């Protein structure tokens, strides 16, 4: 793991960055703290999200955007069906977000916005803002993406095929979000072969590297994603 301290306050583990929380210099965001955590095991990051969400609900923590990568892991949202899981017994973590099964791994930017919504009932509006932010980020690398009616996430749709480049799954409690998005930059795409990502059997998956036909790194893309997501969160969070 990169840049992580494990502390034990009041009898439980807490995940804390070793460096200051930062904001993208291109964005003025007085309300949103940004934490870059590097590579973090999924369950530990999930526990950390819950801790921050509880703090935001209680008014004790600021709105927060976590950006990180995960070691290879499959996670299943609440709508995942038994026949959508890997057939070879590969372990899957069941989580409390919406959506179905997906994969996380290195080469993927994962973002967890934990914010108090200005309109606590506008969950769809929140998802649309995140989608628009990722669409704008991809466009800066000359990759044209779009929303797909009634299918969350960010897609590429052309004469070749329909393929997903970013997945979104969230949970909202007392008007505060958690979980978030995953944008494929240059991951090992073979990990998707074991599942039907997000439950879709009639579409594919892709990455920025595949669409560009060249290597591209998480470190190149992360500041652009951060900038656009912060702009979106400023519009919809308290």
Ranges and model annotations:
Residues 168:
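Two-metal-ion RNase H-like nuclease active-site motif
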Residues 2-7, 11-165, 190, 194, ...:
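N-terminal lobe of the biotin/lipoate ligase/transferase fold
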Residues 71-72, 171, 182:
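Anionic group-transfer/hydrolysis microenvironments
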Residues 155, 190-238:
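C-terminal accessory segment of soluble enzyme catalytic cores
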Residues 176-184:
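Conserved phosphate/anionic-ligand binding catalytic regions in large, soluble enzymes, centered on
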Residues 157-158, 172-174:
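Short, low-complexity Ser/Thr-rich regulatory SLiMs
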